[in-house]
């Protein structure tokens, strides 16, 4: 990190949140060496710090699902590459249908998951009650 700002740069990124850091990272990976990232406080100390950081990998389209899956892969690669733990944990999730329309959507998502190697399964009410008896 430089103590003074350079007079020129190939790219100047304003904001050291998740998006700004990602742009700087990807430019550097692409071979750019003249990149400046400006942040008024500490990296990821603003909105990024306050975010829950949830990454739902199954989205409504191929493009957004691929983007979310890439984000998960990237977090794993960054830890392997740098030795720094980004604090990312894969916990999974449960989605519950309260009507027939939502049930159809969840069935579609469970089928859709296999296209992206995202582990997903569809459970009927009886199986859920057996696995998690306290769930009402």
Label each region the model flagged.
Residues 27-28, 113:
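Hydrophobic alpha-helical packing residues
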Residues 8-9, 32-33, 91, 118:
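Short coil/turn connectors at secondary-structure junctions
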Residues 17, 40-41, 99:
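Fold-independent oxyanion-binding glycine-rich loops
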Residues 53-134:
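Dinucleotide-binding Rossmann-like beta1-alpha1 core, especially the glycine-rich loop
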Residues 28-49:
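Glycine-rich FAD pyrophosphate-binding loop
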Residues 3-19, 36:
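Beta1/beta-strand and adjacent pyrophosphate-binding region of the FAD-binding site
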Residues 3-6, 29, 88:
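Short, flexible hinge/linker loops that cap or flank conserved catalytic cores
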């Amino acid at each position: 990190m430089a103590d003074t700002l350079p007079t020129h740069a190939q790219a100047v990124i304003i904001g050291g949140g998740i998006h700004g850091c990602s742009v700087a990272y990807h430019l550097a990976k692409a071979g750019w060496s003249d990149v400046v990232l400006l942040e008024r406080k500490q990296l990821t100390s603003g909105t990024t710090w306050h975010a829950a950081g949830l990454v739902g990998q199954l989205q409504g389209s191929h493009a957004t699902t691929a983007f979310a899956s890439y984000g998960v892969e990237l977090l794993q690669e960054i830890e392997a590459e740098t030795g720094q733990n980004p604090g990312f944990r894969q916990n999974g999730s449960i989605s519950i249908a309260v009507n027939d329309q939502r049930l159809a959507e969840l069935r579609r998502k469970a089928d859709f998951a296999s296209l992206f190697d995202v582990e997903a399964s569809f459970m009927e009410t009886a199986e859920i009650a057996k696995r998690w008896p306290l769930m009402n």
